[in-house]
Amino acid sequence: MKLSVVALAALVSVAAAQGVSELPKCAQDCASKGFPSSCGADVKCVCTSNSFLDAITCCVATTCTAEEQKKTIQFAKGICGGVGVNVPDSAVCPTGGSSSSGSASSTPTSSGGSSSETGSVTGTAITGTNSPTPTSRRPSGSSTAHSSGSGSPATSTGAPTQTGNAAASVNANGGLLAAIAALVIAVA
């Protein structure tokens, strides 16, 4: 109980320093919807609640003007940044599904082969590349008219490599407006 009071006091002091008047009315309305009650006054919990973030960010993206979105994002950065959660520079409304694209190619040659795969997924900020490049040796040898020869068996060696870049964001919204909701609940 005592910890909740301390957390609430910290939230209120951060919000006061931020200035509630800087938060557009449209964002205040969005923040009052769907607040994750399981978080209580835990700002970090609110700033990382995926379902809440999707709902509030979509609300701000569709109901606030570009200028109001900018002010809302700056406000959220001040609060969520204080607990180590990064907030993106824009409000996006996640789509119901995801889309992906990719390509693959293979170019065998007499000395070996190579292949590469590239793909991306939108809506979750995850991209990656997988490029295995195996090499192989074919039998080699020589022969004469007397039918003698030498050779070596075919061998294959390869070390597939994988490189990737996954944005270390909780989701596409990254805590964008969770701070606003925490403020609205704390002040209410």
Curated annotation (Swiss-Prot):
Q: What residues does the annotated propeptide cover?
A: 166-188
Domain-level remarks: The CFEM domain is involved in heme-binding and contains 8 cysteines and is found in proteins from several pathogenic fungi, including both human and plant pathogens. The CFEM domain adopts a novel helical-basket fold that consists of six alpha-helices, and is uniquely stabilized by four disulfide bonds formed by its 8 signature cysteines.
Would you identify the family this protein belongs to, as annotated? Belongs to the RBT5 family.
Keywords attached to this entry:
Cell membrane, Cell wall, Disulfide bond, Glycoprotein, GPI-anchor, Heme, Iron, Lipoprotein, Membrane, Metal-binding, Secreted, Signal
PROSITE patterns assigned: CFEM
**The UniProt record lists the keyword DNA-binding:** no
Please give the InterPro entries that the UniProt record associates with this protein: CFEM_domain (IPR051735), Extracellular_membr_CFEM_dom (IPR008427)
The segment annotated Disordered runs over: 95-163
Task: Look up the domain of life of the source.
Answer: Eukaryota
- Provide the residue positions that the database annotates as binding heme: D42
Record's signal peptide: 1-17
The keyword Isomerase belongs to this UniProt entry's keyword annotation:
no
A Pfam family annotated for this UniProt entry:
CFEM
Describe the PTM.
The GPI-anchor is attached to the protein in the endoplasmic reticulum and serves to target the protein to the cell surface. There, the glucosamine-inositol phospholipid moiety is cleaved off and the GPI-modified mannoprotein is covalently attached via its lipidless GPI glycan remnant to the 1,6-beta-glucan of the outer cell wall layer.
Q: Where is the CFEM domain?
A: 18-107
What compartments host this protein? Secreted; Secreted, Cell wall; Cell membrane
Report a single Gene Ontology molecular function: metal ion binding
**What is the membrane topology here?**
Lipid-anchor; GPI-anchor
Give the lipid-moiety residues, type GPI-anchor amidated asparagine.
N165
Name recorded for this polypeptide: GPI-anchored hemophore ARB_01017
Sequence intervals crossing the membrane: none
Q: Which Cys-Cys disulfides exist here?
A: C26-C64, C30-C59, C39-C45, C47-C80
Cellular component GO terms held in the UniProt record? extracellular region; plasma membrane; side of membrane
Q: Describe its function.
A: GPI-anchored cell wall protein involved in stabilizing the cell wall.
Organism lineage reads as: Eukaryota, Fungi, Dikarya, Ascomycota, Pezizomycotina
Against PANTHER family, the record matches this protein to:
CFEM DOMAIN PROTEIN (AFU_ORTHOLOGUE AFUA_6G14090), GPI ANCHORED CFEM DOMAIN PROTEIN (AFU_ORTHOLOGUE AFUA_6G10580)
